[in-house]
Amino acid sequence: MKARGILIDTSVLIDIDRGKEDLPDLPCYISIVTLYEFIRGKADPIKAKALAEDIFGVIPLDNKVIEEASIIWRKLRSKGELIDERDLLIGATSISRMLPLWTRNKKHFSKLEEHGLTLWR
């Protein structure tokens, strides 16, 4: 089954920006957290933000994402397997929107697969 779109993690977004990766032929989204991580290192963050918003759908941190992240955080904490907060929010965005996540950090995000995360590629 072909994905109805994908959520792109910061690691892949950087590769796309550097010309090391091409966008797939399907709708591509980024989390607002990914947008922040990406533009904060740019010489002109305002211009980088505008360009990213022209190319990708930007998914905000809404109640659905925050609730999903909170539930997963408690489960990870109980097992002593917490991950970076930003990655948790990106993963929760992917899960709550039912979008596979394209990331270079598969080992890290694989902790979220049992919580409903699907990794792309």
Question: Would you name each region that the model predicts?
Answer:
Residues 1-56:
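Short, well-structured N-terminal submotif of metal-dependent ribonuclease cores
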Residues 1-4, 91, 95-121:
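Acidic, PIN/NYN-like endoribonuclease modules and their adjacent C-terminal/linker elements
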Residues 12-13, 34, 65, 89-90, ...:
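Alpha-helix capping/helix-boundary segments
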Residues 35, 48, 66-69, 87:
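A general structural signal for well-ordered alpha-helical segments in protein cores
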Residues 56-78:
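Acidic catalytic patch
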Residues 80-83:
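Donor nucleotide-sugar recognition loop
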